[in-house]
C-alpha cells in the first residue's frame, strides 16, 4: 500500500487531506467546513459517502504533506 507523510497539526485549511480523530477512530480524509459548526470529511474514493458531523466532534491530528506510492 501507499505510505503518507503527515505533519502534526491541530488545524487545516479547507480541502487539505488530514488525519482526523472521530469517535475515537482515526481517519484520512479531505476536510471542508460547512458553515460555522459542521465539518465534511470527504474520502478520496468517490464511491464512499462523505461524513458530515459537528465540528466539535472532529480533532485534526495532522496534515498530509507527502505520499510514497509503491509500484
Where are these regions (language model features)?
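Acidic/glycine-rich C-terminal interaction modules and beta/coil loop segments
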Residues: 2-71
Amino acid at each position: 500500500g501507499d505510505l503518507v507523510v503527515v505533519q502534526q497539526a491541530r488545524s487545516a485549511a479547507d480541502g487539505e487531506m488530514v488525519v482526523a480523530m472521530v469517535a475515537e477512530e482515526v481517519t484520512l480524509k479531505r476536510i471542508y467546513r460547512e458553515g460555522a459548526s459542521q465539518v465534511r470529511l470527504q474520502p478520496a474514493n468517490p464511491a464512499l459517502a462523505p461524513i458530515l458531523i459537528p465540528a466539535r466532534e472532529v480533532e485534526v491530528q495532522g496534515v498530509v504533506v507527502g505520499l510514497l506510492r509503491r509500484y
